Design a protein with these regions (language model features):
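Conserved acetyl-CoA-binding loop-helix of GNAT-fold acetyltransferases
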Residues: 94, 100-113, 140
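Conserved active-site alpha-helix within GNAT-family acetyltransferase domains
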Residues: 105, 129-147
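Conserved acetyl-CoA binding element of GNAT-fold acetyltransferases
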Residues: 84-96
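A short beta-loop-alpha structural element at the N-terminal edge
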Residues: 6-20
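Conserved GNAT acetyl-CoA-binding A-motif
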Residues: 116-126
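Conserved beta-strand in the GNAT
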Residues: 61, 67-75
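Conserved GNAT-fold acetyl-CoA-binding loop/helix
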Residues: 6, 23-48
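A short helix-loop-beta-strand connector motif used in the catalytic cores of GNAT acetyltransferases and
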Residues: 48-61, 88
Length: 161
């Protein structure tokens, strides 16, 4: 039986689930030596900052057979010199045992659709230097390493040439 996969925009009712996913992302990042602090957000902050009158970021949720198994958290940027918007991907996560099943690609392709709607020239993000599996995944999508900060790669996925 094939799984039903859906990627949708998160809404205010998803704030608790987003908080849970952010916790999973922090655990994963700790394992990759990409984060060593404590999470200081909470459901109320997520509701105010993602779903208030002026959202500071947006989230896509990955659902498989109706169960949320991942998310992408992003915000828009604008270059005055280029006159172009772009997207900064803050977080991308597929929960533990559900990785390597193509779900990350589903999230990234949904994010690419969002980029197209906003006429974004590209999507950018960074990744832990130790997460080489993710580096390979991003390159397979067509993203390129735009620059390095020490050992940390910064990726750029162009939406058009």
């Amino acid at each position: 039986m094939e799984n039903r996969v859906n990627v949708r925009k998160a809404n205010k009712k998803d704030s608790g689930k987003l908080l849970e996913l952010i916790g999973y992302k922090a655990e994963f990042d700790r394992s990759m030596k990409g984060f060593n602090g404590e999470i200081s957000t909470n459901k109320g902050k997520i509701e105010r900052t993602l779903f208030g009158d002026v959202p500071f970021a947006h989230a896509l949720l990955l659902e498989v057979d109706g169960k949320v198994l991942g998310f992408a958290l992003f915000h828009y940027r604008y270059s005055s010199f280029r006159g172009e918007p772009s997207i900064w991907l803050d977080d991308l996560l597929v929960v533990g045992r559900h990785r390597s099943k193509g779900y990350g690609a589903e999230l990234m392709h949904a994010l690419k659709i969002e980029a197209g709607k906003s006429l974004a020239s590209h999507i950018s993000w960074t990744a832990s230097p130790y997460n080489t599996k993710a580096h390979n995944f991003y390159k397979k999508l067509g993203a390129e390493v735009e620059r390095m900060d020490g050992q940390r790669p910064y990726f750029r996925w162009a939406m058009y040439d």
